[in-house]
Amino acid sequence: MIKKITLITVSTLFFFGCSSKNNVTHSENLTALNWHYKIHKDIEDSNLDQADEDFLSLQAEHPSSIYIKTDLLTLYLAHQQNKEYDLALFYLSEYEKRYSSVEEIPWIEYQKIKMNFLKYDTPFTNQKMLLDIITMCDNYLKKYPNSSYAPEVSTILAKAELTNKYLNAKISRLYKKLDKPKASKLYETKIPSNSKPPVIPWYKKLFYW
């Protein structure tokens, strides 16, 4: 089972582009503690590619090491701070599957919502992703209404719903320009008068309707 998990981890990290990483060296035959120290040194040096590589080696050489648990969370936080949200989510999901306690689940699910919301950095696109975030928030608030993270999830939900309203309004206007009144009507929405539209960098506006 451990070998299978390691292989899955290797293949998943490869998917994220390990083959094209620069400034990565391969070491071997270190103690688990030395790998642990090396991973933390990599992160201190802002070399997350090397940290990923060294974590794979730690797992391969010491699959039962006590350091894997803490290093998964450390790498999650490091990639989150570096705005590499897909990799952050990968490490968090690995931690959840292998080590999380029941008490940690509300925090982990909140972190997943936050990461997905931070990934959504191009307003007026990818409505499915936006709707998925809204669904995740709704499910969280139903499942963990008394969680200490519920207020933050409610804030994300409000922002996502408002962004979706602006997106629907934009789609409605587009259909109206295309002389498709029925389709336009489907997307009509009322936007709060005191709200502000999502901010889009000028260079991204070139690709919007």
Annotate each language-model stretch with its function.
Residues 1-18:
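Sec-dependent bacterial lipoprotein signal peptides
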